[in-house]
């Protein structure tokens, strides 16, 4: 059996034994050393997130492919989800798109609640940082997920940037609307970054296959390019 076959067999076995576990028991990936230019640039431009209201980000999947069971929307908007004791996670995926470079950064929250009992289990949000090159990159635009579309910042105000780090806000201001992202002048928190190609096979498979209910993993194969098309700022 060759190495690829062994890897596939192991990933299949690991995925078959993965489970849905409590949201506060998912252990995040430590941010690895970059091995590619895309990985290096992704770290350089990693955004920060300010939680205006609602849950703080949590890891969605661990190295063995176990995924978060999320939280039922009860109590306050941040009840039970003010931060994981194991640390949190930001997920990344990057590609050249329409002559520029799209770096999608995604966060997972265990629930999306507006009022007690109103909302849904699980939330995925993302922003796209658009760069002009990889050699001497600079930010051309920002896109922040807003329900089924995006908020666009082209070019972004300097107040929305902390050096190379975009400042992103997670909030809702309407009882009937779920949480979404926008640019902000307020500094936020950062998490360890794990890129799509740095995840274990078991973790990638879990993110591809797990049903997160009303929330969709934006960077998985079926969604990534379609999301970039919506996020594109031109």
UniProtKB/Swiss-Prot annotation:
GO terms for cellular component: extracellular region. InterPro entries: NPP1. Glycans are attached at residues 35, 66. A motif (Hepta-peptide GHRHDWE motif) lies at residues 119-125. It comes from the Eukaryota. Keywords: Glycoprotein, Secreted, Signal, Virulence. Secreted effector that contributes strongly to virulence during infection by P.capsici. PANTHER family: DOMAIN PROTEIN, PUTATIVE (AFU_ORTHOLOGUE AFUA_5G00600)-RELATED. Key residues/motif important for the effector activities are degenerated in most NLPs, including the nlp24 peptide consisting of the conserved region I (11-aa immunogenic part) and conserved region II (the heptapeptide GHRHDWE motif) that is important for phytotoxic activity. Belongs to the Necrosis inducing protein (NPP1) family. This is NLP effector protein Pc576423. The lineage of its organism: Eukaryota, Sar, Stramenopiles, Oomycota, Peronosporales.
